[in-house]
Amino acid sequence: MQTKTLIIGNGEIGKSLFEVLDSVYECFIRGKDNTKEHFDIIHICFPYGDDFVEEVKRYQKLYTPTNTVIHSTVPVGISRKCGATHSPVRGLHPNLARSLCNFIKFVGGSDEVADYFRHAGMRVYLCRKPETTELLKLNSTETYRREIKAVQQLEKVCQKYGVPFAEVYTIATQTYNEGYSKMGYSEYHRPLLQPLQKTIDGHCVEPNHEIIEKNKIMEL
């Protein structure tokens, strides 16, 4: 399959995507010296910002792709405004190339893009709407954020009462999960996290929370 591919964004996501796709497709990462030419598919891998839609449309006009895939975390509805497919990246920083090959790759809105990723060796789950995958990613990082904050708070409460955090939370959660596994109900497992000794910085957790808050994503 000869699909001329351009990745726009040279951070961890862009570099990792290139590592996976380059062995299958004619693949480039956009640099300052890129000239105006046609690419069959462009991958948007730069962070969301106020001018995100305008930037995506500028690249679409410049490179005239048949398909545009947004891998960035964006507010619900942005991919549709761009006429793009959405496909969030999940996994462990900085080893995202390995994560791309091991996690199911959700694709929102395009059978053709789903087949493109399958041809590159990825396991794909196709959602009919890009809004589905946009909300999926926001919910994923927001859930992780809430769980981390809850564990941080519990550690402080344990210190207040002079009781061991390991017993109140770690061992209790481990044995809770073991019990449900033995009973055949692993779907009731609870996450087992360690309290961070600093603020939640990360690559995406707090920026994604800001997207949710600013755009009132979770409000009814």
Which residue ranges define each predicted feature?
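NAD(P)+-binding Rossmann beta1-loop-alpha1 motif at the extreme N-terminus of oxidoreductases
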Residues: 1-41
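Short, hydrophobic beta-strand segments that form beta-sheet elements in well-ordered domains
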Residues: 5-7, 23-32, 65-72, 104-109
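Conserved beta-strand termini and adjacent loop/short-helix elements that scaffold enzyme active sites
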Residues: 10, 28-33, 85-89, 127-130, ...
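Gly/Ser/Thr-rich loops at beta-strand to alpha-helix junctions
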Residues: 11-13, 73-78, 144
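Short, well-ordered alpha-helices that flank and scaffold nucleotide-derived cofactor binding pockets
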Residues: 19-23, 61, 214
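Rossmann-like NAD(P)-binding element
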Residues: 31-67
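Rossmann-fold dinucleotide-binding core
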Residues: 55, 67-136, 212
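Interdomain hinge/lid region at the active-site interface
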Residues: 134, 145, 149-220
